[in-house]
Amino acid sequence: MKQGRLNVGVVGSDASGIAMAQALAQAGHMVVAVSQAPLDSDDSLEVLLPLAKKVSEEKVLELADLVLLAVPAAQIEAKIESLSNSWRAGQLVVHLAAEFDHEILAGAVSAGAIPLAIHPAMRFTGTSLDLNRMKESFFAVSAPVVALPIAQALVIEMGAEPIVIESSARASYAEAIEVASNFSAMIVNQAIGLLEQAGVPNPALVIAPVIESAVDQALSKGHRQIKPEDLIGDS
């Protein structure tokens, strides 16, 4: 391993963890182990992370200097506890959930691990598109003061932009991400369905410019009171 390079391991199979492992590999780190093959990808583990061995979760922790917890937010504490005898001093442990800061990793910290919360503000597809989109994205970071530069440096190495989210603001941040992601998907799905009912060919292609221009306009205007004239369909 090169000077300053880390052996990276992934516990879990969430698409965000696999994509971040790929990005770290591109930055020169070595992804050495994963506990599960990715569930949300059409590509095999050998294609996505060719140098990684599929091993037990405990073995991932044994091999890795940096552990990505690619598990659902509701499972983080239980996962940390189930591996309580495997964490070690100086090991970096990273969770990827929007709603929690680094303090949820206290169980690993008690063994001397260094906790980092790194959440990519993007919607993952489980495809190669994720790596390119990461380079246009912001990652929310949270860590103890002495470890915050490590979290920021890792994000920069992955090609993204780190933003520090304070513990008190984490819930609002997570809600914003959820609203933007879920409501966008629901609205697009509804619009495509209406066009299909109307017999419009290629409904996704037809509606795409409308959605893109509406989103661009809303982003440029920022948060404000929505007026009736803003909602006129043919304006």
Regions found by a protein language model. Give the residues of each.
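Phosphate-coordination loops involved in phosphoryl transfer and adenosine-cofactor binding
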Residues: 4-7, 90, 136
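Hydrophobic anchor at the start of a short beta-strand
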Residues: 8, 30-32, 115, 162, ...
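Rossmann-like NAD(P)(H) cofactor-binding subdomain of soluble oxidoreductases
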Residues: 20, 47-129
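Short, charged/polar "capping" segments at the starts of alpha-helices
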Residues: 39-45, 101-104, 147-149
